[in-house]
């Protein structure tokens, strides 16, 4: 237990808080979310992109499931700070799926691998581009800190970039398959909502299959989580 946790525990005991040890965990999770977001907002590690829109941690820091996306989306550019998928067609899609599965979204934590709007300037115009490996590696420390602080029971990896932080491969081949992060946290990769949207927009013949498989993968995660941890109320029905 570090110094901050010891200080919180001492305050909790003085206040006669029921179950002070769990109170420490609760307080640390709240502080961790605020601290991560404070650092993200002021981060200037990547000169090319650090002065634009930032993706911060969203959802409930006490939640059971960490949902990791890829990067700030084009529709989100221009805001000071955004939560992953907030205000986008991808967000509408994923929340529709979660609603159909009766998921209690109070049990979810949201963050991205890359916390900036990655772009390049061409003829004075800002154009979206894929994150560089160096940008992904720089931002990974936030994910490591979040896992240490929030202690999620499960992690969902939305897309290739999210999966490759922990396991090298291609989502099409790895989706729907469990693997372990840090030997104890079950993780599952699935398609990025952005990829599904792109396939639908170009009329890809397998786009409908991708969406169905995406829903199947999420259903698998949440059903197992509910069975293993019924007290968490991960599913509402």
Regions found by a protein language model. Give the residues of each.
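A polyanion-binding, active-site-adjacent surface
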Residues: 2-237
